[in-house]
């Protein structure tokens, strides 16, 4: 069934007087109850944007006859379409003990094991009782975003554990980054015997992403959109859970570096492991190589324009949370799913946002009296999604709401439907309409159209309306080009493929042994010259 969703926000020069905040607004501005939770909330809000991230949500477990406080579900909940991210944040001091294994086991139980069990319980509850999650401990305000149906939902469990960084640096020595190592043959209690190594904390082998105080910031700053982060988490789980293969990684940041520097079918990926391999160890130092590379510097510079897109999403979200988002004049406010509109904008990766922002800015710069301007961006191969950026100057004397805005919404609606005639493979269209930047005041209309099903008669009707507006016609001057922008302005490759390391008896080597092996390899190379 074809769906058309429209919404509007208004921007104008002037002073806004804030009234009482809505429950949704208060939830969006909540910062957590501890310093570590506040730190997590800050970086998460930047990456996930405030419409989809909620700190310290609760269930009604423990309440009886409407009395008592609810039970905390998790420290941070992100709900975005079919993706649900559950975060636990624990800041535990590392115990002092002469035996590092004893100290590690105690810290591991309180920081990682406890977090993993909490996250597994939160996932189980959310799937079973999605209508019993609240924004407050009194369980008065329900979560405003509906959780996806369990049959299509994808949950990610993320344990942020603080307190191990400095002890790990001291333990590994030799300039170690101090991040927790990943070792995939460890399960449950196996961890007690391997200080600062993480495999699968849960006996069920349900995957838990364990991040420390350093790697959580690196990860959420490098992959600062929901689709980018979810792709990484999903592919990481696949990479580390390959059957009959043990992987040793000297820290989450090293894994992230390999992911960012490896592409397959124009998407980030992890290195291919040759068939028959039973153990692979990634080298230490890849993150430093990647982080200081001119390619990454150029990427971050090129990404700057993309945050215009984030600003557009966040600004519209503020109206949705406040309950003041406006609908088309002919639409009842209650039938508009404003969240779906802005989610369509937020579903774009950082790279796509870069080009979309450039296209939007170009459209806003166009201003010719009496003429509308449209720029259409299509994504996918073959194209499945169309973005329509439309600017229409106001005509002096016309009423803004009854004439100008109605005219603009009609034109945007026709564009977002009739574009299907020009590209039959399209399944959805997202439109943004505004006055040009040259105007002294501007507002934006947004529209989301599901084009997956459109009958021949519907297509003819939209074609007729497009002809009436003299748009998208065969004789209309259109410029078509393929966007060839690369994420890294220059190709990025590491100097060598990941080496494999095995210690005595086939056991995985630790950081110190790994460095010793690398020094010996360098000496051998020098002697052979």
Language-model features: locations:
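Intrinsically disordered, low-complexity Ser/Thr/Pro/Gly-rich regulatory segments
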Residues: 1-74, 78-514, 519-529
